[in-house]
Amino acid sequence: MNIIVVGLSHKTAAVEIREKVAFAPTQMEKPLQAVVALPDITEAVIVSTCNRVEIYATTRDVAGGMARIKRFLADYHNVPLELLEKHLYSYHGEDATRHVFRVASSLDSMVVGEPQILGQIKTSYGYAAEYKSSGIILNRFLHKAFSVAKRVRTETKIASSAVSVAFAAVELAKKIFGELSDKTVLLIGAGEMCELAAKHFINTGVRGVMVTNRTYERAEKLAEEFDAKPVHFEALMETLPKADIILSSTGAPHFIIHEKDMEEVLRRRKHKPMFFIDIAVPRDIDPKVNNVENCYLYTVDDLNGVVATNLEQRKVEAAKAEAIVEQEIGQFFKWLSSLEVTPTIVALRTHFDEIRKAELSKTISGWKDLPPGAEKKLDALTNAIMNKLLHQPTSVLKRIDQGNRNDLYVDALRNLFDLEVGGESQDNMMELED
């Protein structure tokens, strides 16, 4: 069984493309069930964040599985495959494992070392577990990824010099305005990113913070935590003129602020500049807002320059983290190999033993005047011959590396001897220790 990854990220696709294939976190059941319904796809997890959309799956048909998932992404989101495909990457085997371990450890993030991605993958895995699209392989795979991320955070200092996307957004605001003590901030959304942004804005000494969310109770809760002012979402347009800085991070599937809204907002502000930071994917703010005089709109893709701080120190720590990832890949594949190899060895020995016993029984039943103890000796002799014959193929199977060669050996044995490999036992499925 092969693990495959198909996806795109901030490295391969601009936000205009990423938002086209983003999945709403509250509506994961339908796409997860659709992926595992694809031919030869047995398990699936979907990860959808502001910086990446990835599907992790298991299949015996690597090329076919990747092609079907690419087609699924295009068809599900009504995006032409030829437009999407040039932004997609795909991995299998060790490359897939390395990629996911690196993503979970924040080595592939826009902000290397940021902690948010691990929580986002855990949430994605939670949906897959809830809707039963993940099984024994992806369950173990992602638990191992979480373990790798924990090792990276505890054994390196990669997180100590990292900045979050929210922090980068605040730093960008400081670069635009300089002094923020006379500025009022409006946060649209009440999730983790807005919570982090609230913390950073408060620390910079802004004049005030307002929070709005479709669920007013969540806005109230976040506002209370930071001594901010909660605002009903229905009052968004009336509230905008009071804000100098607007940071938006909701899960809305469409724009919540449009170009046509801004003329009246700016008139009421006497055309004082407004700074918009849209870190939502799909985007919350119509990009045409940037065409309005005195409106300055930035997206998550504009934060790259800010996150370059402390880059050299993070490179040193990232090298240590990469070594941990490589070490853990070997451990995981040792476990994954056992899922294929152990049941095949058991089936092979059972197959030979059944033949041995059948032939021995025929021989003994046609042998008159069998000396006392001969049956026992013949049984031992034939068993020893069988063990000698099976020793070499068994040893080879146990020591070869997991990968394409392993699949070839296992498949060849199963086909040559028409082996029926049943469900793996719990002993064979024992997880590696974290």
UniProtKB/Swiss-Prot annotation:
A Pfam match: GlutR_N
More about this protein: During catalysis, the active site Cys acts as a nucleophile attacking the alpha-carbonyl group of tRNA-bound glutamate with the formation of a thioester intermediate between enzyme and glutamate, and the concomitant release of tRNA(Glu). The thioester intermediate is finally reduced by direct hydride transfer from NADPH, to form the product GSA.
Binding residues for NADP(+): G189, A190, G191, E192, M193, C194
Catalytic site positions: C50
Organism: Citrifermentans bemidjiense (strain ATCC BAA-1014 / DSM 16622 / JCM 12645 / Bem) (Geobacter bemidjiensis)
GO biological process: protoporphyrinogen IX biosynthetic process from glutamate
Signal peptide segment: none
Full protein name: Glutamyl-tRNA reductase
Family statement drawn from the similarity comment of this UniProt entry: Belongs to the glutamyl-tRNA reductase family.
Subunit structure: Homodimer.
Swiss-Prot/TrEMBL keywords: NADP, Oxidoreductase, Porphyrin biosynthesis
PROSITE patterns membership: GLUTR
